Amino acid sequence: MAQTQGTKRKVCYYYDGDVGNYYYGQGHPMKPHRIRMTHNLLLNYGLYRKMEIYRPHKANAEEMTKYHSDDYIKFLRSIRPDNMSEYSKQMQRFNVGEDCPVFDGLFEFCQLSTGGSVASAVKLNKQQTDIAVNWAGGLHHAKKSEASGFCYVNDIVLAILELLKYHQRVLYIDIDIHHGDGVEEAFYTTDRVMTVSFHKYGEYFPGTGDLRDIGAGKGKYYAVNYPLRDGIDDESYEAIFKPVMSKVMEMFQPSAVVLQCGSDSLSGDRLGCFNLTIKGHAKCVEFVKSFNLPMLMLGGGGYTIRNVARCWTYETAVALDTEIPNELPYNDYFEYFGPDFKLHISPSNMTNQNTNEYLEKIKQRLFENLRMLPHAPGVQMQAIPEDAIPEESGDEDEEDPDKRISICSSDKRIACEEEFSDSDEEGEGGRKNSSNFKKAKRVKTEDEKEKDPEEKKEVTEEEKTKEEKPEAKGVKEEVKLA
């Protein structure tokens, strides 16, 4: 399968400003706020100029029941913190309550996460983008009738079902530290979806993903599991990921790829035990992108939220084939990234328990399984079912140039490289970074002493205007789908 290096591809990105408001509860490791932090960081890096940004629609119950059972989705729609006592039996039945708590706006959170992934799949199907990104998606543990591992609705399965309307074969790759059990289970008996998961195995949630789990029936050999031990580093991960994925591409020949980019496989994750850097993690994105296939990039796990934001911002830049500086731009959550205020992280000194012999042995076993695959299966394509989302109306070329264009249309426009000056320094004084942030703190008190009250008033007004700018920009980017 042809590989290309550094090809610029069209990218669209889904984000809803409300997603950061949802709260699983005190002490719970899953924090949707990390999606807002990611969005704010990539805005301040200026990445929004190079891609189309959409606000996802809220997926409805009908869309969700394309995979999930009716009674499970009905339960998720009905349950609230104030009526939990009426649902105690169902909570047990659907595994809701501990890891997967009931919180305010639970169903709306699922709607946004799912809406972004399904809309991304529709965009890819219509060839309106090459890469679609939804960092609020990637909730890979949810089952047909059960919540699991902080996941309630499996947006990945629903997005893959949408892709299968147009694509004969879809490849799913999971680089979260946890096994992608919910997605594997959904497609365990089909040869149209291959699931490939690299994960920690052995006394670790969810406890599945053994090397010998290879699929069943028509799906035999279409589930690929690479069980790993603690402490895997960039070098070892790259040494297994590239050859395995090359062989998978050669044997399966997919026409679309879904990549779950769970960042709990990074060094220093609150729940993880791997030792990958952001660059090592992103090498997987880069490699999959090089096959030049329609690609859906999703979030997933990630519990040290400052590193989640760093990782997904950098991987958005990789998708855009854009280099961004290691020095973080000033942003709404700047203090989270101290004391170094840098984009990239260093690995720890933990031991890599994955010996070369162990990794080689697993790799050879997987190659043997992949050799058992028949040549890429042919599928008799039938009439294409209706898209999950109605087509957007209006042709930009036919619009009257004298009329003001809608916010939706203007936000879909991508700026040409030459349209802006080389400098990203917006506003007087330039874009703030760590050094002038610290300097500003030092001289603040001296400045205040010197200024007369009238001058102070003027400065306050100016600062107020500057502070409002990024927020306005963020709102501008959140576009409603037609």
UniProtKB/Swiss-Prot annotation:
Recorded catalytic activity of this chain's protein: N(6)-acetyl-L-lysyl-[histone] + H2O = L-lysyl-[histone] + acetate; N(6)-acetyl-L-lysyl-[protein] + H2O = L-lysyl-[protein] + acetate; N(6)-(2E)-butenoyl-L-lysyl-[protein] + H2O = (2E)-2-butenoate + L-lysyl-[protein]; N(6)-[(S)-lactoyl]-L-lysyl-[protein] + H2O = (S)-lactate + L-lysyl-[protein]
Subunit record text: Part of the core histone deacetylase (HDAC) complex composed of HDAC1, HDAC2, RBBP4 and RBBP7, the core complex associates with SIN3, SAP18 and SAP30 to form the SIN3 HDAC complex. Component of the nucleosome remodeling and deacetylase (NuRD) repressor complex, composed of core proteins MTA1, MTA2, MTA3, RBBP4, RBBP7, HDAC1, HDAC2, MBD2, MBD3, and peripherally associated proteins CDK2AP1, CDK2AP2, GATAD2A, GATAD2B, CHD3, CHD4 and CHD5.
Cross-link (Glycyl lysine isopeptide (Lys-Gly) (interchain with G-Cter in SUMO)): K444, K476
Protein name in UniProt: Histone deacetylase 1
Modified residues (N6-acetyllysine): K74, K220
Positions of post-translational Phosphoserine modification: S393, S406, S409, S421, S423
Induction behaviour: By interleukin-2.
Any one of the GO BP annotations: positive regulation of DNA-templated transcription
Chain segments carrying region Histone deacetylase: 9-321
EC number: 3.5.1.98, 3.5.1.-
Gene behind this protein: Hdac1
Cellular compartment(s): Nucleus
Ranges of biased composition (kind: Basic and acidic residues): 401-416, 443-482
Binding site residues for Zn(2+): D176, H178, D264
Regions of compositional bias (Acidic residues) in chain numbering: 390-400, 417-427
Co-factor(s): Zn(2+)
Family as reported in the entry's similarity comment: Belongs to the histone deacetylase family. HD type 1 subfamily.
Sample GO molecular function, one term: promoter-specific chromatin binding
Residues bearing the modification N6-methylated lysine: K432
Position of the Glycyl lysine isopeptide (Lys-Gly) (interchain with G-Cter in SUMO2) cross-link: K74, K438, K444, K456, K457, K473, K476, K480
Keyword Transferase among record annotations: no
Entry comment on modification after translation: Sumoylated on Lys-444 and Lys-476; which promotes enzymatic activity. Desumoylated by SENP1. Phosphorylation on Ser-421 and Ser-423 promotes enzymatic activity and interactions with NuRD and SIN3 complexes. Phosphorylated by CDK5.
